[in-house]
């Protein structure tokens, strides 16, 4: 590889690292909302997987043991939905970073 080619690759790597750091900060501060039960339960989560808020529709509030189990299932489903959305958002944004870069075949990024 020519000396200029190596310098170009190093410059690209440095630029990518800077972009990755900025993107990771943006992703960490982004919020997604996971839902279940047709919106009866919703969870707001950050890109760091921190739960900011859980909302439960009043119609689900009951002292009946069966209703309690349904509510627990809906909360778990809403949390899982939020986690999937965080992961999907992260993959989409980070995957777009390598577009247009001339990376060697088979080169994999650390994310």
From Swiss-Prot:
InterPro entries found in the cross-reference section: YbaB-like_sf, YbaB/EbfC
Region (Disordered): 1-25, 87-111
Record has Transmembrane as a keyword: no
Keyword Cytoplasm found: yes
Pfam families found in the cross-reference section: YbaB_DNA_bd (PF02575)
One GO CC term on file: cytosol
Residue intervals passing through the bilayer: none
Keywords: Cytoplasm, DNA-binding
Reported function: Binds to DNA and alters its conformation. May be involved in regulation of gene expression, nucleoid organization and DNA protection.
Complex formation: Homodimer.
Family membership noted in the UniProt record: Belongs to the YbaB/EbfC family.
The protein, known as: Nucleoid-associated protein PP_4268
Species whose genome carries this gene: Pseudomonas putida (strain ATCC 47054 / DSM 6125 / CFBP 8728 / NCIMB 11950 / KT2440)
């Amino acid at each position: 590889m020519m000396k200029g080619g190596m310098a170009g690759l190093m410059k690209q790597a440095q630029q990518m690292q800077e972009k990755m750091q900025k993107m990771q900060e943006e992703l960490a501060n982004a919020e997604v909302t996971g839902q279940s039960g047709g919106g009866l339960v919703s969870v707001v989560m950050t890109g760091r997987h921190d739960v900011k808020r859980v909302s439960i529709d009043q119609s689900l509030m009951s002292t009946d043991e069966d209703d309690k189990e349904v509510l627990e299932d809906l909360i778990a489903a809403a949390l899982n939905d939020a986690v999937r959305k965080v992961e999907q958002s992260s993959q989409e944004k980070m995957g777009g970073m390598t577009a247009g870069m001339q990376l060697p075949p088979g080169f994999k990024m650390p994310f």
